[in-house]
Amino acid sequence: MKPVQITTIKMKNFKLFSNSNKRLYSKCKTNSYDVLVVGGGIVGFATARALISRNKHLHVGLVEKENRPSVHQSGHNSGVIHAGIYYKPGTMRAKMCIEGLYKTYEYCAKNNIPHKKCGKLIVATNESQIKSLNDLYERGLENGTPDIKLINGNDIKTIEPYCNGVRAIHSPHTGIVDWAVVTKHYAADFVNLGGQITYNFKVKSFEEYKHNRALRIISEKNVLLL
């Protein structure tokens, strides 16, 4: 077997060993880190971006197994900007959904990301579904979903002529966006703030090392010592 060429990136309290042919992106000249995020989807880049923007003294890195951001779930979903109707009232998820709704539109507008506030209809197609629809409407009200209302069949046709139903919830602030594009903007923000990205780094395992004093993060050809 041909030996793997190794380079070492020194980090605060740990070292990153990586193949020399791996792509490394950074505006930051230092190679010392305080925090490393694993995973380059929207959650990973949002987390890394928030960490470095709120803690400018930290040196933050991110590793991703693919050669670009949002290859998997973040780039393959329905693309909905949710307005907070479905989640259990009082939960963190419900609260964050409403807050995220406004922040998403603000971020997309600021960064010229294509998006559309198209609205959404949740339709009861027959009388037997009305109770469930009413319950969902009450949940949306309790969550603070903005401007939702119950409408009848005629109003449904006004909004969407090809939709048939006896009653519906109209959520005018629900929208659509390509979350893969949002993720790429988060990645650019992260790098512009001094973050560092290593692509083609697939983490395979985490192992305790030397009596709980360090952690080995292992990929197919790389070892990260924490």
Language-model-derived ranges and their functions:
Residues 52-75:
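Glycine-rich FAD pyrophosphate-binding loop
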Residues 169-226:
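Helical element adjacent to the flavin cofactor pocket in flavoenzyme catalytic cores
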Residues 79-159, 165:
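Dinucleotide-binding Rossmann-like beta1-alpha1 core, especially the glycine-rich loop
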